[in-house]
């Protein structure tokens, strides 16, 4: 089985990504926040798409479309609250992820750190635009 795992081109990709993945010796629960960020982002995108199917951005009907989502759409209230609370959870995980990077000295890898800071500012700008939308 290990020969197929090491030699087959498609299985080799999965092997290097999941099975023989090098992990640091000091791995702990702090290393979960990157995966939780991906999960939170997927939930935000999914619930955002579902909410966008029923939301009307016209100033005259925006409030009534939100009321329609909460009252008339099946589990619309749940989707709306998952989207709202998911944004807060996303930022909690994001700041804990950055804090873990600072604690473990990840800023020494300059290119990776700079890319993370650019992504942090892009996420914060996107969230600001989401809160400011009429």
UniProtKB/Swiss-Prot annotation:
The record's annotation in Pfam families points to: Cytochrome_B
Record-annotated residues binding heme b b562? 83
Cofactor: record remark: Binds 2 heme b groups non-covalently.
Give the record's GO biological process terms: mitochondrial electron transport, ubiquinol to cytochrome c
Q: Which residues cross the membrane?
A: 33-53, 77-98, 113-133
Top-level taxon: Eukaryota
Q: Which UniProt keywords apply?
A: Electron transport, Heme, Iron, Membrane, Metal-binding, Mitochondrion, Mitochondrion inner membrane, Respiratory chain, Transmembrane, Transmembrane helix, Transport, Ubiquinone
GO terms for molecular function, please? metal ion binding; ubiquinol-cytochrome-c reductase activity
Q: Which cofactor does it need?
A: heme b
List of residues binding heme b b566: 97
GO annotation, cellular component aspect: mitochondrial inner membrane
Q: Which cysteines in this chain are paired by disulphide bridges?
A: none
- Bilayer topology term: Multi-pass membrane protein
Q: What does the subunit section of this Swiss-Prot or TrEMBL entry state?
A: The cytochrome bc1 complex contains 11 subunits: 3 respiratory subunits (MT-CYB, CYC1 and UQCRFS1), 2 core proteins (UQCRC1 and UQCRC2) and 6 low-molecular weight proteins (UQCRH/QCR6, UQCRB/QCR7, UQCRQ/QCR8, UQCR10/QCR9, UQCR11/QCR10 and a cleavage product of UQCRFS1). This cytochrome bc1 complex then forms a dimer.
Q: What does this protein do?
A: Component of the ubiquinol-cytochrome c reductase complex (complex III or cytochrome b-c1 complex) that is part of the mitochondrial respiratory chain. The b-c1 complex mediates electron transfer from ubiquinol to cytochrome c. Contributes to the generation of a proton gradient across the mitochondrial membrane that is then used for ATP synthesis.
Task: Please give the family membership noted in the entry.
Answer: Belongs to the cytochrome b family.
Entry protein name: Cytochrome b
């Amino acid at each position: 089985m290990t020969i197929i795992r090491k030699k087959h081109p498609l299985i080799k990709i999965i092997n290097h990504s999941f099975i023989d993945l090098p992990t640091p010796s000091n791995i702990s629960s702090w290393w979960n926040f990157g995966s939780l960020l991906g999960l939170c982002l997927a939930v935000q995108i999914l619930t955002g798409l579902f909410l966008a199917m029923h939301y009307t951005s016209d100033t005259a009907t925006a409030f009534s479309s939100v009321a329609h989502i909460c009252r008339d759409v099946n589990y619309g209230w749940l989707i709306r609250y998952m989207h709202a609370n998911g944004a807060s959870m996303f930022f909690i995980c994001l700041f804990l992820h950055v804090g873990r990077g600072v604690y473990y000295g990840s800023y020494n890898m300059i290119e990776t750190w700079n890319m993370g800071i650019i992504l942090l500012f892009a996420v914060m700008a996107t969230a600001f635009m989401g809160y400011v939308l009429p």
